[in-house]
């Protein structure tokens, strides 16, 4: 049996500025020790506000924030065992690499020998051994990122907060840093809480993801759970690309959409309940028109390197997006085939608690 330890807990936390609508609205969640978490959502969803509340840069309007079993609402930022890596890294340009990393230790008045040992160990962890005397202005974006992380881990915090730290990097370097951050977190065993609006980053790096929108957590879970079983239209559309159509759940394992009935793997709905149906683009296979479960016309096509992105329209005007390695032409009449497992049925207005309970019932039946 795996024993987990909760390191951070939000209980009914609200954050409101003046008389504006709440930036966070009655949010509750738990963060387990030693995992990589991502707060994912569009601009203004509240993800950075959560980070600042944990760091102590903001104070909650309502609710309690716990570190372990201790309420930390009134504890100042410099007294919390938390370090933040900012989007712009916030390095001191007049200090070299060594002094940037040593800065927090000097504030704590550690002995010179202890500082030297800790700084060199932190730089070794981020693969910057030998860069101690390098000026910040001489460092690349990726190297500055590593310096900022070394400065965070040198204080041996219980939690490291990362506020969109990869957003300023080019695509290749950003991908490399994703692997490095994930590897570093595993080696350190420290809880990482990472903020991003980039879905691919979240899916690639996280043990768990919190998807936020308009100050509320829409869904939390592993990357696979959230991608394969989105709770609502927002999550389905925000995490990856989706085909979403209105439908009706006829009975367990049978759903109707585009005026046809299909076998599915979903259950626990009321007979003839109005639902939304999701099929991912990579789960649609292009066939001849007569063999397809859906008959569509190719409207446009883009080459994306590893696959073609094909936009199609069915006879009712519904748009379908397909990811395929098969080349087609605009105007072609084709069929789209898919397995029952490719169909995901979403209940309108379902809460995360209700959603989890319904998924658990699937396991009980199996």
From Swiss-Prot:
Catalytic activity line of the entry: ATP + H2O + polyamine-[polyamine-binding protein]Side 1 = ADP + phosphate + polyamineSide 2 + [polyamine-binding protein]Side 1
Residue ranges of every copy of the ABC transporter domain listed in the record: 8-239
Subunit structure: The complex is composed of two ATP-binding proteins (PotA), two transmembrane proteins (PotB and PotC) and a solute-binding protein (PotD).
Residue numbers binding ATP: 41-48
Entry similarity comment: Belongs to the ABC transporter superfamily. Spermidine/putrescine importer (TC 3.A.1.11.1) family.
Compartment(s) where it occurs, according to its Swiss-Prot or TrEMBL record: Cell membrane
Class of the enzyme per the UniProt entry, highest EC level: translocase
Pfam families, A to Z: ABC_tran (PF00005), TOBE_2 (PF08402)
One GO cellular component, as annotated: ATP-binding cassette (ABC) transporter complex
Catalytic activity, EC: 7.6.2.11
Keywords of this entry: ATP-binding, Cell membrane, Membrane, Nucleotide-binding, Translocase, Transport
Record-given protein name: Spermidine/putrescine import ATP-binding protein PotA
Membrane topology term: Peripheral membrane protein
Gene3D superfamilies, per the entry: 2.40.50.100, Nucleic acid-binding proteins, P-loop containing nucleotide triphosphate hydrolases
Chief location bin: membrane
Summary of the function given for this chain in its UniProt record: Part of the ABC transporter complex PotABCD involved in spermidine/putrescine import. Responsible for energy coupling to the transport system.
């Amino acid at each position: 049996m795996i024993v987990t330890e909760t390191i951070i807990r939000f209980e009914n936390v609200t954050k409101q500025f003046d008389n504006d609508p709440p930036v966070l609205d009655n949010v509750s969640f738990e963060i387990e020790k030693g995992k990589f978490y991502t707060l994912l959502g569009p601009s203004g969803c509240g993800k950075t506000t959560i980070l600042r509340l944990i760091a102590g840069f903001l104070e909650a309007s309502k609710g309690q924030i716990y570190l372990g079993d201790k309420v930390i609402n009134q504890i100042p930022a410099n007294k919390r065992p938390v370090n933040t890596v900012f989007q712009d890294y916030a390095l001191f340009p007049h200090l070299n690499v060594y002094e940037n990393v040593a800065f927090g230790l000097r504030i704590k008045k550690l002995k010179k020998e202890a500082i030297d040992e800790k700084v060199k160990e932190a730089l070794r962890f981020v693969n910057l051994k030998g860069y101690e005397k390098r000026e910040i202005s001489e460092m690349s974006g990726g190297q500055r990122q590593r310096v900022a992380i070394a400065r965070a881990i040198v204080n041996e915090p219980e939690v490291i907060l990362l506020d969109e730290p990869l957003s300023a990097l080019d695509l290749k370097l950003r991908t490399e840093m994703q692997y490095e951050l994930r590897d570093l977190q595993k080696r350190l065993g420290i809880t990482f809480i990472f903020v991003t609006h980039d879905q691919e980053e979240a899916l690639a790096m996280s043990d768990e993801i919190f998807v936020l929108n308009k100050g509320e957590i829409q869904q939390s879970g592993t990357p696979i759970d959230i991608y394969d079983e989105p709770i609502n239209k927002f999550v389905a559309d925000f995490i990856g690309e989706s085909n979403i159509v209105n439908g009706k759940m006829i009975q367990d394992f049978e759903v109707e959409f585009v005026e046809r009935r299909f076998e599915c793997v979903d259950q626990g709905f009321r007979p003839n309940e109005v639902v939304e149906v999701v099929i991912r683009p990579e789960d649609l296979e292009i066939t001849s028109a007569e063999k397809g479960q859906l008959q569509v016309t190719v409207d446009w096509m883009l080459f994306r390197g590893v696959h073609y992105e094909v936009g199609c329209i069915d006879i009712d005007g519904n748009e379908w997006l397909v990811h395929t390695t098969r080349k087609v032409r605009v105007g072609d009449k084709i069929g789209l085939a898919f397995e029952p497992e490719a169909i995901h049925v979403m209940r309108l207005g379902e809460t995360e608690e209700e959603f989890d309970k319904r998924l658990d019932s699937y396991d009980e039946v199996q």
